[in-house]
Design a protein with these regions (language model features):
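Conserved ABC ATPase signature
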Residues: 152-157, 161
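Helix-to-loop junction immediately C-terminal to a conserved catalytic motif
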Residues: 62
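A short, proline-enriched helix->beta-strand linker immediately N-terminal to the Walker B motif
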Residues: 172-176
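Conserved ABC transporter NBD signature motif
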Residues: 70-78
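P-loop NTP-binding/switch modules centered on Walker-like glycine-rich loops
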Residues: 187, 191-269
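Short catalytic/signature loops enriched in Gly
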Residues: 2-4, 17-22, 27, 147, ...
């Protein structure tokens, strides 16, 4: 098992504000007591509905936002105590690829200037001084010959080409960690596959580590080694992609999997869709107990009052759900006596058929 590059313990982020004339104050708990690690050389996917806190975690990991509580370590060093030149030096090892390449690239600057700027900031001089590195980065992401791109502006390229440029910019400082915040959601399906293939190739060639944020489970299956599922500021399940897709142990994870479309008509009619009732509660006023209990199809009386703790159900597979606690449910799965693992409810025990057909074994 690879050592952890990023370690997060008890991470919490609360945003505060006030209404007109400061008469009414409000707080939003975007991230609540989150703990996980990202291992060297792996891709950890962070999935969940919009507003669940995925992008907030990305900004916290990169120190673009200060945490309210908790601890973030990069390569064993706490980020909280870093500032000034020390933080600047550490940021060379952490870069980000944003969702919309058109919004993240300066429309007034040439591609050569955009790619050379990170080197100019960290090494000094002007972006034009680093033409050799710029050419190498463009070639690395498949934009060849580089001379055809250096003097052009972002609007002259397609969406896929712009995202390749954004990836090249993230690679200029040769980082160890890349945070990819929905990097393919703004692209069409064919271009999306090309960008994912590029990112996998770069990871193999350069030894990159990805924190990959997405809402698309098909993308998770394609690129990730492990996946963490978030709901309303908390991680409800985390583990290997194969393990979670084959046997989800949290009702929310199962609902997400069941919502994925099935292109094969031979199996789509047998697909059990789990319909979640109600809306996602407001993070300004989260439910007591388990935050998912108002929408859970397998809710228990205890769920509304006691927050579940994450239990390890298999090596590296953790889920925070009372249904996995034998002391509460009182029945064990057949053949699992003494393991502490209980049989999931029948409504969400089996994986959707689409995830078993045509599996990919590209990663361990």
């Amino acid at each position: 098992m690879n050592a952890a590059l990023v370690s997060i313990e008890g991470l919490t982020k609360v945003y505060e504000g006030s209404g007109l004339f400061g008469r009414r104050r409000w707080t939003v708990q975007a991230v609540s007591d989150v703990s996980f690690e990202v291992r060297r050389g792996e891709t950890l996917a962070l999935v969940g509905e919009s507003g669940c806190g995925k992008s907030s975690i990305a900004r916290l990991v990169l120190r673009l936002t200060e945490p309210t509580a908790g601890r973030i370590c990069f390569a064993g060093e706490p980020l909280a105590g870093m500032s000034g030149p020390r933080l600047k030096a550490q940021r060379r090892h952490m870069q980000i690829v944003f969702q919309d390449p058109m919004a993240s690239l300066n429309p007034r600057k040439t591609i050569g200037h955009i790619l050379g700027q990170p080197l100019a900031v960290h090494r000094g001089g002007r972006p034009a001084h680093y033409l050799d590195e710029i050419r190498q980065a463009l070639a690395l992401v498949g934009l060849t010959p580089p001379e055809q791109f250096i003097q052009r502006l972002p609007h002259e390229f397609s969406g896929g080409q712009r995202q390749r440029i954004a990836i090249a910019r993230a690679l200029m400082l040769r980082p160890e960690l890349i945070v990819a915040d929905e990097p393919v959601s703004a692209l069409d399906v064919s271009i999306r596959a090309q960008i994912l293939a590029l990112m996998k190739r770069l990871q193999g060639e350069l030894g990159l580590t990805y924190l990959f944020i997405t809402h698309d489970l098909g993308v998770v299956r394609s690129i990730a080694h492990r996946v963490a599922v978030m709901y309303l500021g908390k991680i409800v399940e985390i583990g290997d992609v194969a393990s979670i897709f084959a046997a989800p142990r949290h009702p929310y994870t199962a609902a997400l999997l069941s919502a994925s479309p099935i292109p094969d008509p031979e199996v789509s009619w047998r697909h059990r869709r789990i319909i979640l009732k109600g809306d996602v509660p407001s993070p300004a006023n989260p439910p007591s107990g388990c935050r998912f209990h108002p929408r859970c199809p397998a809710v228990l009386p205890i769920c509304g009052t006691v927050a579940p703790v994450a239990r390890e159900l298999a090596p590296g597979h953790l889920a925070a759900c009372h249904l996995n606690d034998p002391a509460i449910v009182g029945e064990r799965a057949p053949g699992m006596a003494g393991t502490g693992v209980v049989e999931p409810p029948r409504a969400w025990r089996d994986p959707p058929p689409s995830f078993e057909k045509g599996r990919s074994d590209d990663h361990p």
